[in-house]
Swiss-Prot record:
Cofactor note: Binds 1 Mg(2+) ion per subunit.
Main location: plastid
Cofactor names: Mg(2+)
Note, other: The basic functional RuBisCO is composed of a large chain homodimer in a 'head-to-tail' conformation. In form I RuBisCO this homodimer is arranged in a barrel-like tetramer with the small subunits forming a tetrameric 'cap' on each end of the 'barrel'.
Location(s), subcellular: Plastid, Chloroplast
Cellular component per GO, a single term: chloroplast
GO molecular function: magnesium ion binding; monooxygenase activity; ribulose-bisphosphate carboxylase activity
SUPFAM superfamilies per the UniProt record, alphabetical: RuBisCo, C-terminal domain, RuBisCO, large subunit, small (N-terminal) domain
Upper taxonomic lineage: Eukaryota, Viridiplantae, Streptophyta, Embryophyta, Tracheophyta
The name this protein goes by in its record: Ribulose bisphosphate carboxylase large chain
């Protein structure tokens, strides 16, 4: 090669592979108010130091790759790289660590949950140096929160729209979830609404199948709503599931719901995707529709304790993307949910400011500034005997949703709805009178059965029903200390 055409490496660039921790592990780093902070549960492969594993997570979820590249010199790596700034062992677990990672805000597109997750939980979860990886929590800085519109309306606006205050809202998922004709489906909705429920609901997989096309369902459910409203004098709603195969079809269904004058639509935000969800949320805000969110597929992501993503992260993401309700588990029903963990992410959904509290699984203080709150929905295997516990656990700003606990009543849907409404009103009144729902709950329900035969029949049917299984997702504790106790 002639001297004129010879190319020399630029000064300062050295090709090859070097440990991630040399660049991305920075324990001396002081986090900024504008950083997005993440807490990862890291299980390294044998022989991989925790500092290297944490640094690898920071690198692969921000600016790094497996080898040094010359284009690093064309940007300010210190400005844009993620940093692992802390490592701590997980109590009671061998070879598991919490790695704290800080991401500069400029790594993320404004107002895009999709981009945020693509960066933070994109390729890194398949990284070979890690046996398992779980995103436990995120701190969203106020500077980034303000780029999101959040829920279409929020808790207070929903109460004003419905003219319902001072108690949890009551709902019911129509069962069987698949197979009913549109007319029979609408009839089931009407019976539940006239019996005293505030809402009925499409199940997550009710979209537009051969046995019941979406337009027919919307029409018959709207008829049920208006008929029940005329008879009861209360505002009613049905969560019309607008989830579809394309965003265009989803929005077409939402437009039709608005034209019918119904108050609320529904979306499966994980299977539908965050881009679709945010688009639907914007439409609902602009057109006065409430938005109910179902979390179908969440357990695929969040149920394993050492790999995936905790639901508190999915809950925060939903508040940013937009939704007025979201299913949150029940603590007492058939679906997964430990009490302290559940109450932790319920607060993250509803409150404006949440302090760090590791006893409830909250790793970071979170300030939502002016972003509206989301109503948690307790649903799954609950019935009238659970009403005192649900009222005590979730409080007024919640939706208590009884599917089988309404439709399984021996006298039919309307008496099932009556039983739930009577049980709720009895619990709210007892609480307001200063009684302890946690210790007097069963007595309160028994007293109410004396003047409600519908409630008495429901209590008899479900008196022996319990779902006593240990939760998979539990708080971290020192197992050796627990054994000594």
């Amino acid at each position: 090669m002639s001297p004129q055409t010879e190319t020399k490496a630029s000064v300062g660039f050295k090709a090859g592979v070097k440990d991630y921790k040399l660049t991305y592990y920075t324990p001396e780093y002081e986090t900024k108010d504008t950083d997005i902070l993440a807490a990862f549960r890291v299980t390294p492969q044998p022989g991989v130091p925790p500092e290297e594993a944490g640094a690898a997570v920071a690198a692969e979820s921000s600016t790094g790759t497996w080898t040094t590249v010359w284009t690093d010199g064309l940007t300010s790596l210190d400005r844009y790289k993620g940093r692992c700034y802390g490592i701590e062992p997980v109590p009671g677990e061998e070879n598991q660590f919490i790695a704290y990672v800080a991401y500069p805000l400029d790594l993320f597109e404004e107002g895009s949950v999709t981009n945020m997750f693509t960066s933070i939980v994109g390729n890194v979860f398949g990284f070979k140096a890690l046996r398992a990886l779980r995103l436990e929590d995120l701190r969203i800085p106020t500077a980034y929160v303000k780029t999101f519109d959040g829920p279409p309306h929020g808790i207070q606006v929903e109460r004003d729209k419905l003219n319902k205050y001072g108690r949890p809202l009551l709902g019911c998922t129509i069962k069987p979830k698949l197979g009913l004709s549109a007319k029979n489906y609408g009839r089931a909705c009407y019976e539940c609404l006239r019996g005293g429920l505030d809402f009925t609901k499409d199940d997550e997989n009710v979209n537009s199948q051969p046995f019941m096309r979406w337009r027919d369902r919307f029409l018959f459910c709207a008829e049920a709503i208006y008929k029940a409203q005329a008879e009861t004098g209360e505002i009613k709603g049905h969560y019309l599931n607008a989830t579809a195969g394309t965003c265009e079809e989803m929005l077409k269904r939402a437009v039709f719901a608005r034209e019918l004058g119904v108050p609320i639509v529904m979306h499966d935000y994980l299977t539908g995707g965050f881009t679709a969800n945010t688009s639907l949320s914007h439409y609902c805000r602009d057109n006065g529709l409430l938005l109910h969110i179902h979390r179908a597929m969440h357990a695929v992501i969040d149920r394993q304790k050492n790999h995936g993503m905790h639901f508190r992260v999915l809950a925060k993401a939903l508040r940013m993307s937009g939704g007025d309700h979201i299913h949150s588990g029940t603590v007492v029903g058939k679906l997964e949910g430990e009490r302290e963990i559940t109450l932790g992410f319920v607060d993250l959904l509803r409150d404006d400011f949440i302090e760090k509290d590791r006893s409830r699984g909250i790793y970071f203080t979170q300030d939502w500034v002016s972003l509206p709150g989301v109503l948690p929905v307790a649903s799954g295997g609950i019935h009238v005997w659970h009403m005192p516990a649900l009222t005590e656990i979730f409080g007024d700003d919640s939706v208590l949703q009884f599917g089988g606990g309404t439709l399984g009543h021996p006298w039919g849907n309307a008496p099932g709805a009556v039983a739930n409404r009577v049980a709720l009103e009895a619990c709210v009144q007892a609480r307001n009178e200063g009684r302890d729902l946690a210790t007097e709950g069963n007595e309160i329900i028994r007293e109410a059965t004396k003047w409600s035969p519908e409630l008495a029949a429901a209590c008899e049917v479900w008196k022996e029903i319990k779902f006593e299984f240990q939760a998979m997702d539990t708080l971290d504790t020192d197992k050796d200390k627990d054994k000594k106790r």
